[in-house]
Amino acid sequence: MNKIAGYVLSVAALAMATPATAQFQKPEDAVKYRQSAFTLMGNHMGRVGAMVNGRVPFDAKAAQDSTRVLALISTLPGQAFAANTESVQSKALPAIWKEQDKFKAGYDKMVAEVAKLDAAAKTGNLDAIKTAFGEVGGTCKSCHDNFRAK
């Protein structure tokens, strides 16, 4: 897991060091980038969710590993919602670009709640993780309800 976290950190650092417009040669590249980030986020949310919901035994280290990766990845997809990506076929609704302030506020809230989930996981306290996980899930649901096609 440490190799994965190191890789994600390297990618995140490179992504933050390069302006978003320079990162993507084509609008389709930006869409693939954000979809990939969201897929990874969903994977790590699923791992933590399985522990939170009792489908698998709670493993504090595994929860910490997943929330660490989740916290890093959550900061990445926002930059890939450039105006030139609106016409690329995806589940992103036009409301993202029509209500940019609302979308950005929701995205920023998600990133903040993921950071809180990561902090809760570092305590090793399952109840704290459950509470924070619910908050993250609420931000995901809100965005999916308002900005993602069914």
Task: Show the residue positions of the predicted features.
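Bacterial N-terminal signal peptides that target proteins for export
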Residues: 1-8
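Bacterial N-terminal signal peptides
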Residues: 8-15
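N-terminal signal peptide c-region/cleavage motif recognized by signal peptidases
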Residues: 17-19
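Sequence context surrounding c-type heme c attachment/ligation sites in exported
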Residues: 24, 28-60, 66-150
